[in-house]
């Protein structure tokens, strides 16, 4: 049993951490998504990046701010670490691995998701997920470790045309 394996290998504390950070978070998002499933999508962009405010997600965020897209879109950053950085108008931040009803609301209503590292599951089929790869992968079979699928990602940006066939094979 997978649950018993987690307890044996990582202990009860890690089990409760997984339940809190992942399972409760997903449950809240599913519940909020059910409530708003008939509501239209809003001009919300959800960004996740490898480290907070960096990689391709950071470059995309900088582009959005420099070109005033935060005037039309609410930009929601999903952070891995608590951060006291001051954000410009119409930009909000939430911890990726902490339950939040407001974060779940934004996830359930967002038009666009971007990710560099951890793919945040779309709540609805009419949302679009863009994956910005942040580097090259090893030239070996990564399929067992590649936690992405064509169901989760609508558009995949690779670092080079030379990697396109490799990525397509891995998904």
Can you describe what each PLM-predicted range is?
Residues 43-171:
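Active-site and donor-binding regions of nucleotide-sugar-utilizing enzymes
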Residues 1-43:
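Membrane-proximal basic amphipathic "stem/tether" segments
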């Amino acid at each position: 049993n997978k649950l018993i394996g987690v307890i044996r290998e990582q202990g009860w504390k890690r089990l409760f951490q997984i339940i809190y950070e992942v399972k409760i978070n997903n449950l809240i998002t599913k519940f909020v998504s059910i409530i708003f499933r008939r509501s239209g999508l809003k001009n919300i962009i959800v960004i996740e990046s490898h480290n907070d405010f960096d990689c391709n997600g950071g470059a995309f965020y900088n582009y959005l701010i420099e070109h005033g897209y935060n005037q039309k879109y609410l930009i929601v950053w999903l952070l891995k670490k608590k951060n006291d950085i001051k954000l410009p108008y119409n930009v909000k931040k939430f911890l990726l691995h902490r339950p939040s009803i407001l974060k779940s609301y934004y996830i359930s209503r967002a038009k666009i998701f971007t990710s560099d590292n951890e793919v945040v599951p779309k709540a609805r089929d009419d949302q679009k997920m863009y994956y910005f790869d942040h580097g090259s992968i090893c030239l070996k079979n990564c399929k067992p470790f590649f936690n992405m699928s064509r169901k989760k990602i609508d558009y995949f940006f690779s670092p080079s045309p030379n990697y396109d066939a490799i990525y397509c094979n891995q998904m």
